[in-house]
């Protein structure tokens, strides 16, 4: 399973990259705004800065919601760096644009996916990634993890090459459950990735080893 970090914060991206397990980055307009990045030139420079840090794919989201606008924005975004993946919303014109991009060899991430039917359309259109949102489904008392399992199963049935990129991952159990059902990628905040490091028995065991070492060696 690939690990992507869901942030536009350069320090967090560097920290995840330094762990040696980072496979990519996902961003969105909200994350850019959180970092105070505004204006097309600044946004593009920030994407380039992200690409300079990581070795893997960087999802950059279009703002347009019409077919022509999505195409224009996507074709601009890919000029930033070969690592850029165009993030396209799950809407009618988005699906049409994903098909266009697929035919042109431009990689895409279909975002805001909340049903297996939407994921099926994205795969049929040739999306590189599809991003189902686990946490947001959980927020409305629907089972986000069940959706991930459904999509993984459907894609395996038909040998679709679209990768299931689980998004809106809120905690480590979300991440572990995604691994259990076979998600190809998980994108999450830095604290979820680093949360995998922690276990009280690891801490107590290490403390005992160090204490015993001190007793023996003074």
Swiss-Prot record:
Record localization: Cytoplasm
Pathway: Carbohydrate degradation; pentose phosphate pathway; D-glyceraldehyde 3-phosphate and beta-D-fructose 6-phosphate from D-ribose 5-phosphate and D-xylulose 5-phosphate (non-oxidative stage): step 2/3
Catalytic reaction list: D-sedoheptulose 7-phosphate + D-glyceraldehyde 3-phosphate = D-erythrose 4-phosphate + beta-D-fructose 6-phosphate
Listed GO MF terms: aldehyde-lyase activity; transaldolase activity
Sorted UniProt keywords: Cytoplasm, Pentose shunt, Schiff base, Transferase
Pfam families, alphabetized: TAL_FSA (PF00923)
E.C. no: 2.2.1.2
One GO cellular component term noted in the UniProt record for this chain: cytoplasm
GO biological process: carbohydrate metabolic process; pentose-phosphate shunt
PROSITE patterns (alphabetical): TRANSALDOLASE_1 (PS01054)
SUPFAM superfamilies, A to Z: Aldolase (SSF51569)
Annotated active site: 87 (schiff-base intermediate with substrate)
InterPro entries: Aldolase_TIM, TAL/FSA, Transaldolase_3B, Transaldolase_3B/F6P_aldolase, Transaldolase_AS, TSA/FSA_arc/bac
Main localization category: cytoplasm
UniProt family annotation: Belongs to the transaldolase family. Type 3B subfamily.
Function: Transaldolase is important for the balance of metabolites in the pentose-phosphate pathway.
Name by which UniProt lists this protein: Probable transaldolase
